[in-house]
């Protein structure tokens, strides 16, 4: 079928046209509904995609792929309870489908059902002992620890020469963490380094380009900005800004424990609004910023609020957490003059090491080399200092170590800054039942604050160059002490 062929080569616009044409003559074909739904989802037509995928389930309730694709779409929309139900239905219909088992286990992680998730990953490994995604899924649970038998099995799987580069990277990442659990940090570091070197060949990233980007953003927003048309626009929004592995998931969990706040997890709406404006003007961000009028910024803020309205159906406030938000603080503050932002910053050395240890999917070239990670961290610190000076009354500077040392006082100040009354549920954030899509932290936020997981000292002189780079940039290492890695 031409629609399937277009879909396989990534041309979803063409696939949509073919599937629509075919559905005119075969409106009750579940396969066509699935195909069209998948391609619509890829081009961000989410509402129609979900309708079609649900329609496929209704047309063919005994068709496992219908439930699987519907579950995957729900998962991407953070509807994790519904996703788990659909994926379980798919698994009941086809227990042999490994991808369904993996997806269901990941959904259970997000829902905090960690024991069930571990059992799901283990069942995959019983059926497919060297499955890279299952091993990685277990390693990505930061509350899970491999045993010696796991380490031996991972060593054998990693040593196979017939695996794809991505499978070897997933297995290597899991193996390194298994070696850490056995106290073998020298070998673990070697494996992390090999994994990152392999990944670096496939991902983009330029330290010089990143520095130019940061400098251009700061220079652009150093200029005067138009006065807002509506000073109340965006009062629903709490932006969360941080590097990866710095505590943003924990801070969101604390805020989402408040009865007036919905935790939206990582959403891309701000980036999508800014990108759409760049396309409309034919000028990349931030080059179009000096030309934007107060009316333009008001329009962009209204578009963002319309895109995120579904997060305010039951609660008046919501969090916007995205690891690219730090580039967009100036745009966010200007288009949403009543929005508040929380800047989460953590010890730079621990942050860089945590990112280096983490296997990121997608384009995360900054984390493939410790020098690149240092550059990225330094650029983040410089730009966020600029934002704090530019918007001093609208950004809460939250030092992660302070939160760990004195949680109640820090949480009280955080809530007051956000215009929220104190609620004890925010102190007992680990009891809050909600989907957490940041898998490395999904298990940790179900527990009280941890005091025993600092790692930089364990790697000794392996991090000496990183320490030197950070010191030269004016980012000295804090006194080593236990802290949580979220």
Identify the meaning behind each predicted range.
Residues 231-334, 340:
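Phosphate-binding active sites in nucleotide-utilizing proteins
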Residues 12, 30-31, 64-65, 98-99, ...:
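Helix-start (N-cap) detector for alpha-helical repeat units in TPR-like alpha-solenoids
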Residues 136-139, 151-162, 171-234, 285-294, ...:
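PAPS-dependent sulfotransferases, especially Golgi type II membrane carbohydrate sulfotransferases
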């Amino acid at each position: 079928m031409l629609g399937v062929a277009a879909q396989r080569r990534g041309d979803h616009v063409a696939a949509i046209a073919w599937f629509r044409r075919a559905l005119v003559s075969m409106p009750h074909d579940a396969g066509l509904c699935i195909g069209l739904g998948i391609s619509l989802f890829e081009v961000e037509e989410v509402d129609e995609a979900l309708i079609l995928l649900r329609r496929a389930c209704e047309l063919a309730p005994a068709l496992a792929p219908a439930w699987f694709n519907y579950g995957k779409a729900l998962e991407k929309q953070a509807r994790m309870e519904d996703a788990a139900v659909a994926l379980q239905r798919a698994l009941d219909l086809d227990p042999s489908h490994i991808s369904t088992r993996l997806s269901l286990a990941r959904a259970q992680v997000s829902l905090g059902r960690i024991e069930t998730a571990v059992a799901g990953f283990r069942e995959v490994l019983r059926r497919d002992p060297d499955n890279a995604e299952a091993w990685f899924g277990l390693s990505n649970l930061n509350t899970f620890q491999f045993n010696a038998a796991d380490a031996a099995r991972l060593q054998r799987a990693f040593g196979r020469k017939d695996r794809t580069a991505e499978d070897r990277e997933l297995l290597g990442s899991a193996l390194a963490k298994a070696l850490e659990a056995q106290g073998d940090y020298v070998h673990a570091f070697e494996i992390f380094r090999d994994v990152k070197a392999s990944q670096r060949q496939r991902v983009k990233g330029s330290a010089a380009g990143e520095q130019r980007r940061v400098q251009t953003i700061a220079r652009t927003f150093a200029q005067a900005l138009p006065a807002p048309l509506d000073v109340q626009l965006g009062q629903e929004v709490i932006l969360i800004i941080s590097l990866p592995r710095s505590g943003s998931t924990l801070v969101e969990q604390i805020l989402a424990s408040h009865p007036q706040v919905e935790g939206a997890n990582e959403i891309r709406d701000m980036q999508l609004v800014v990108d759409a404006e760049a396309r409309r003007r034919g000028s990349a961000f931030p080059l179009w910023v000096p030309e934007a009028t107060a009316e333009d910024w008001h329009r962009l803020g209204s578009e963002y609020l319309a895109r995120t309205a579904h997060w305010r159906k039951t609660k008046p406030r919501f969090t916007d957490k995205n690891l690219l938000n730090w580039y967009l603080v100036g745009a966010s503050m200007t288009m949403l003059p009543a929005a508040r932002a929380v800047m989460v910053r953590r010890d730079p050395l621990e942050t860089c090491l945590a990112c280096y240890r983490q296997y990121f999917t997608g384009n995360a070239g900054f984390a493939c080399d410790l020098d690149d990670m240092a550059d990225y961290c330094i650029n983040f610190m410089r730009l966020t200092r600029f934002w704090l000076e530019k918007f001093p009354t609208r950004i809460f500077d939250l030092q992660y170590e302070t939160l760990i040392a004195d949680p109640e006082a820090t949480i009280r100040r955080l809530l007051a800054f956000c215009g929220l009354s104190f609620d004890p549920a925010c102190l007992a954030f680990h009891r809050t039942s909600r989907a957490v899509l940041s898998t490395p932290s999904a298990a940790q936020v179900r527990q009280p604050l941890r005091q025993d997981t600092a790692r930089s000292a364990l790697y000794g002189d392996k991090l000496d160059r990183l320490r030197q780079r950070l010191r030269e940039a004016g980012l000295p290492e804090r006194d080593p002490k236990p802290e949580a890695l979220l």
